[in-house]
Amino acid sequence: MTKRKGKFLLAALICLVLCFIWGNSMLSGEESGAVSGGLLDWLTGTFPFLGWLPEYLLRKFGHFSEFSLLGFLLAWFFLLWDRQWLHRLALPLLFGMTAALTDETIQSFSPGRCPSVTDVWIDVAGVCTGIAVLSLCFSLYLLLQKRKGMSNEKVI
């Protein structure tokens, strides 16, 4: 896959993840509760050892995991655009924080929902985790390539 196609694919995936996140934020409180409750029922039915899991914790984990994926994809996207480490880290974080704030703003207009500063912090922690995972994967990739004798100029 060419670098250009990779950028396009990552941009499309980022847009899909944002549509999923923001689409869930547009649900009313009742609809959102029904989705969370259905997922919790499925999880506890499939994995009985999760019977202790409260819906509140499931919702917070949902925020964290959605934004971890977003952070990973954003970091990968900016890795393809710019090779400077500051840009690779700062731009995905900035975009992720903006997405988190937008998410909570959308919720403020959804019936039965209200924005939460706690959710913004959970979302940003997810973005940071995604960026860290991508950074670790890329560092390991560079290390393996270096051991094989490839120069960094041939990477990406």
Regions found by a protein language model. Give the residues of each.
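Short, charged juxtamembrane terminal tails flanking transmembrane helices
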Residues: 147-156
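Membrane-helix interface segments
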Residues: 4-9, 83-93, 116-117
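Membrane-interface elements of multi-pass transporters and channels
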Residues: 30, 77-85, 109-113, 136, ...
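Interfacial helix-loop-helix junctions of multi-pass membrane proteins
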Residues: 100-125
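"…centered on the first transmembrane helix and the immediately adjacent amphipathic helix/loop
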Residues: 2-74
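Small-polar-interrupted transmembrane alpha-helices in polytopic inner-membrane proteins
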Residues: 16-21, 89-108
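Membrane-interfacial alpha-helical segments at the cytosolic side of multi-pass membrane proteins
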Residues: 66-80, 127-142
